[in-house]
């Protein structure tokens, strides 16, 4: 049998998967156990008005009946430093010790920003990647459990967040210490998504899978994950868009979203860069 020879690459690859993932219809029921596992006793739930209005937030809160829960539901469509600081004030007032993000990429990214400022000194910008701040984000960052309610960004398994800071810049914050300690991926939470949002977030997942696969770094596990995710999204995005109650399509789109972000560590491309410009 002929062997395929590995070609040398100029950059060393990091191959690391950290997040414990609960993935299934009804997985939201594991929320209390995951909180206990990661040491969260007084959680703050970070969400947005749309998730709250759709009743999805209440589904999460029902799992935590009897827990001392604080809620921050003012996440803007694009997370801002102002919103992060408002959430910090509520986090401190509630004597919280961890975070649960229930929503799409915006809520999860805001929670990651909050995980920094709630436990680290100085302004948020100090920890931005472009400012050399990634090494300053320590393991003391507040523990985070991510509960995605859309199938697109994959933020629940990603180590980065994008936040608009006070001077108007859109900055990235990246650290393995920002990885959610758990991701609860319950496709049931996405069945009520409008078709336009299903299509838009689904295309995000497709773009992630394509770009990560084509990135030049050597990371065979990421290649396999990205290709499988692309196949799932390619065959199910139209079905999920046409019929939001199609459970098989919803499950496969949530998987594709997660897989695209799991492969982020291999690298992305121009489309992703332009979307953050």
Predicted regions and their residues:
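An N-terminal, well-structured beta->alpha segment
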Residues: 1-72
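A short N-terminal beta->alpha junction/helix N-cap motif
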Residues: 19-23, 47-52, 75-78, 194-197, ...
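N-terminal small/polar loop signature for handling phosphorylated ligands or for N-terminal nucleophile
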Residues: 52-123, 238-250
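Glycine/threonine-rich beta-strand-loop-alpha-helix active-site module
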Residues: 82-188
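Carboxylate- and glycine-rich phosphate/diphosphate-binding segment that chelates Mg2+/Mn2+
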Residues: 159-264
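C-terminal catalytic subdomain
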Residues: 268-277
């Amino acid at each position: 049998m002929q062997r395929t020879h590995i070609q040398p690459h100029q950059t060393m690859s990091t191959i690391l998967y950290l997040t414990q993932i609960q993935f299934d219809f009804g997985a939201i029921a594991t929320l209390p156990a995951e909180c206990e596992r990661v040491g969260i006793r007084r959680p703050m739930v970070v969400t947005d008005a749309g998730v709250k209005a759709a009743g999805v937030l209440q589904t999460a809160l029902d799992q935590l009946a009897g827990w001392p829960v604080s809620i921050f539901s003012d996440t803007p469509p694009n997370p801002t430093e102002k919103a992060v600081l408002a959430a910090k004030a509520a986090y401190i007032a509630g004597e919280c010790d961890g975070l649960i993000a229930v929503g799409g990429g915006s809520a999860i990214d805001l929670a990651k920003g909050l995980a920094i400022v709630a436990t680290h000194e100085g302004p948020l910008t100090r920890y931005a990647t472009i400012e050399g701040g990634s090494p300053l984000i320590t393991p003391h960052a507040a523990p985070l459990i991510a509960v995605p309610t859309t199938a697109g960004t994959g933020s629940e398994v990603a180590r980065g967040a994008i936040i608009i800071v006070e001077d108007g810049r859109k900055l990235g914050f990246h650290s393995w210490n920002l990885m959610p300690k758990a991701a609860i991926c319950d496709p049931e939470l996405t069945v009520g998504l409008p078709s336009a949002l299903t299509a838009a977030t689904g295309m995000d997942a497709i773009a992630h899978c394509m770009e990560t696969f084509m990135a030049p770094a050597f990371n065979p596990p990421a290649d396999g994950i990205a290709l499988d995710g692309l196949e799932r999204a390619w065959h199910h995005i139209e079905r999920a868009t046409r019929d939001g109650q199609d459970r098989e399509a919803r499950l496969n789109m949530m998987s594709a979203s997660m897989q695209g972000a799991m492969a982020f560590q291999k690298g992305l491309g121009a489309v992703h860069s332009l979307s953050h410009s």
